């Protein structure tokens, strides 16, 4: 992502100075789960494609990736209708998945899917900003937490509470795998006036929220507030070109891995905000890589 694009994106965002009135800001934030429930009522299981790309991006999801002598346990937060779950269960026969969402309707779609069996998966309703995960999942029992386009649906002031909730069920050495919308993404730049609630937070026409992350914000949430160790934290860029429609723009995502401390040395490293020695890749806030995977876009 070159400087010319960044400057152009900043200029577009700087022109959007109007924000949604405070009454409506509070309403949209308080009714986030209600509006997503309506979304799934309208679209059922037909809106998103199954996410077959996740184990390519995150090696921890591949069969044979060893965390311990026990079979791996994964929690998918914001599971929706199961688009992440089904490909992973099919490819990784040893994994067990907990799956939660704050939309009761979405969880019902997961439970009624022909591939659902509680021998391998348990779906439940949970608002991770306020409902304790340990009420359903034993403390410090989960190897992997996946958060794929989830934190962007949460108001910024509630994101730290969600991180703290996740930390309670992570094993020592357990990992959070995250991919979400990044700052200056095409979807952010396409919002019209009247959709902005605050910096980087917007409301779609259907009332659902969308927050656009910087790598610095992710570091703040998971390292500063969550005391996790940063293994990766970068932007993933996909360029979109359509000469017929004169479109030349970029989808930008934030992708990161964080790890729960294993021992006192790791805890000290987490508190200092440093990366684990010998970890997976470098955590350079302004680094970018190109990704050819088809992406999802929700914008009006």
What do the PLM-derived regions correspond to, one by one?
Residues 160-175:
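A short glycine-rich, Lys/Arg-flanked "PGG" loop and its adjoining helix->strand segment in the class I
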């Amino acid at each position: 992502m070159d400087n010319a694009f960044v400057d152009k994106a900043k200029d577009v965002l700087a022109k959007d100075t109007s924000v949604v009135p405070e009454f409506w800001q509070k309403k949209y934030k308080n009714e986030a789960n209600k509006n997503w429930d309506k979304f799934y009522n309208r679209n059922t299981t037909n809106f998103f494609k199954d996410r077959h790309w996740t184990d390519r991006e995150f090696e921890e999801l591949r069969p044979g990736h060893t965390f311990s002598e026990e079979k791996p346990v994964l929690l998918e937060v914001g599971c929706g209708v199961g688009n992440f779950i089904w490909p992973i269960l099919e490819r990784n026969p040893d994994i067990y998945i907990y799956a939660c969402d704050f939309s009761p309707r979405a969880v019902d779609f997961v439970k009624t899917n022909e591939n659902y069996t509680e021998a391998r998966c348990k779906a439940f309703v949970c608002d991770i900003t306020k409902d304790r995960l340990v009420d359903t999942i034993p403390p410090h029992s989960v190897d992997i937490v996946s958060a794929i386009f989830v934190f962007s649906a949460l108001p910024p002031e509630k994101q730290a509470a969600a991180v703290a909730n996740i930390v309670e069920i992570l094993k020592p050495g357990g990992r959070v795998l995250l991919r979400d919308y990044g700052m200056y993404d095409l979807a952010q730049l396409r919002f019209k006036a009247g959709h902005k609630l605050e910096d980087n937070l917007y409301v779609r026409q259907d009332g659902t929220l969308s927050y656009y992350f910087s790598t610095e914000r992710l570091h703040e949430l998971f390292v500063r507030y969550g005391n996790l160790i940063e293994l990766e934290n970068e932007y993933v860029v996909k360029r979109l070109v359509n000469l017929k429609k004169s479109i030349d723009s970029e989808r930008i995502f934030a992708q990161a891995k964080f790890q729960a401390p294993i021992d006192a040395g790791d805890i000290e490293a987490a508190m200092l905000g440093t990366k684990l020695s010998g970890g997976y890749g470098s955590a350079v806030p302004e680094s970018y890589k190109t990704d050819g995977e088809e992406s999802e876009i929700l914008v009006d």
